[in-house]
Amino acid sequence: MADHLTANGEEMGVYNLQCIDLSNPDIHESAALLRKACMESGIFYVINHGISQEFMDETFAQFKRFFDLPIEEKMKLVWNKNLRGYRPPIQAVIDDKTKQKDFSEAFHIGVEVSEDDPNAHDFFYGPNLWPPADLLPGWRKAMEKYHQEATNVARKIGRVIAVALDLNEDFFVQPELIGSANANYTNMFHYGVHGANLLKDVVGTTPHCDLNLFTLLATDDIWGLQICREKNAESQVWEAIAPVKGAYIVNVGDMLEMLTNGIFRSILHRVVFNQERYSTGTFICPNHDYIIKCLPTCTSEENPPKYPTMRTGQYIYNRFNQLSASTVGKKA
């Protein structure tokens, strides 16, 4: 069976991404490539980001250790109201036409927050859930280390994005954006869990745009990620993205589209696959009190702001409420 498939099991085209080399001493050259990618599609590769392949391989081995646990152990860590912890397989129909199902499971972490933090129980923020140390020795330390390293890469990308938008290079690394990293979160994904017939079913995740600024996606060598560059088109054309060893795939999210007044485009994407697959996404988000409004370099009299001004926390809350409502509506 082909590596890259439509949701109906048909072969599809491959979209070739721009590649941003973070070791390039000429940040303006990198910024020009990034700007082109973000205007044309909203997705690109990042290489020479500072994380070794050995570290990435070990991190993916750690993901597998958790997902290999008995479901009874994983369910003891089922995600809380702050969306930290284990998200069990949905196993729900995600496409009414094809009757395809989502058999993925995930684990969600963020920056560790103590129980006595005044904001510890805010939506999408709060203490993490961890498996007992005697069950998975060293697992928490490995996951916290990965989250920290991925956030460091995000800061490097943020500098290139700033230059691409004619802003001060440090704009996105200020504390309320990427700098403090308080609102960033990392999700680990396992596709093709128990119950999926991988020789028959092509299973995946619902098409969506990420709500945050941008996402760092790392995958194993199994194909699965697909994009639609014309997200508002009536007839959507899907293209496969090749997994590249040692590279991050970076998705533009809706918040960055809003900040740039639509100059940078968030990318509609999904996962469709026919083999067991692992991936991880680190979602870069401003602090919840940050006001999302059009950047001064992205508006003019001829191009007034297109999006409403909104506090980040309220935007996240609204988006998840919409998602919950659409899910309930679909099941009904």
Curated annotation (Swiss-Prot):
Cofactor note (record):
Binds 1 Fe(2+) ion per subunit.
> Which EC numbers characterise this protein's activity in its record?
1.14.11.-
Recorded metabolic or biological pathway in which this protein acts = Secondary metabolite biosynthesis; terpenoid biosynthesis
Which residue range or ranges hold the Fe2OG dioxygenase domain?
181-286
Extract one GO molecular function annotation from the record. Answer: metal ion binding
Q: Does the keyword Lipid metabolism apply?
A: no
Its cofactor is: Fe(2+)
Q: Where does Fe cation bind?
A: H208, D210, H269
Chain residues that bind 2-oxoglutarate: R277
Keywords attached to this entry = Iron, Metal-binding, Oxidoreductase
Task: Please give the catalytic activity noted in the UniProt record.
Answer: (1S,3bR,4R,5aR,9aR,9bR,11aS)-1-(1-hydroxy-4-oxobutan-2-yl)-3b,6,6,9a,11a-pentamethyl-7-oxo-1H,2H,3bH,4H,5H,5aH,6H,7H,9aH,9bH,10H,11H,11aH-cyclopenta[a]phenanthren-4-yl acetate + 2-oxoglutarate + O2 = azadirone + succinate + CO2 + 2 H2O
SUPFAM superfamilies recorded? Clavaminate synthase-like
Q: In which tissues is it expressed?
A: Mainly expressed in petioles and, to a lower extent, in roots.
Q: Which Pfam families match?
A: 2OG-FeII_Oxy, DIOX_N
Q: Name one GO biological process term.
A: biosynthetic process
Q: What class of enzyme is it?
A: oxidoreductase
Please give the InterPro entries that the UniProt record associates with this protein. DIOX_N (IPR026992), IPNS-like_FE2OG_OXY (IPR044861), IPNS-like_sf (IPR027443), Oxoglu/Fe-dep_dioxygenase_dom (IPR005123)
Function of the molecule: 2-oxoglutarate-Fe(II) type oxidoreductase involved in the biosynthesis of limonoids triterpene natural products such as azadirachtin, an antifeedant widely used as bioinsecticide, and possessing many medicinal applications including anti-tumoral, anti-malarial, anti-rheumatic, antibacterial, anti-inflammatory, anti-pyretic and diuretic effects. Catalyzes the formation of azadirone.
Family that this chain belongs to: Belongs to the iron/ascorbate-dependent oxidoreductase family.
- Protein known as: Azadirone synthase LFS
Gene name, please? Answer: LFS
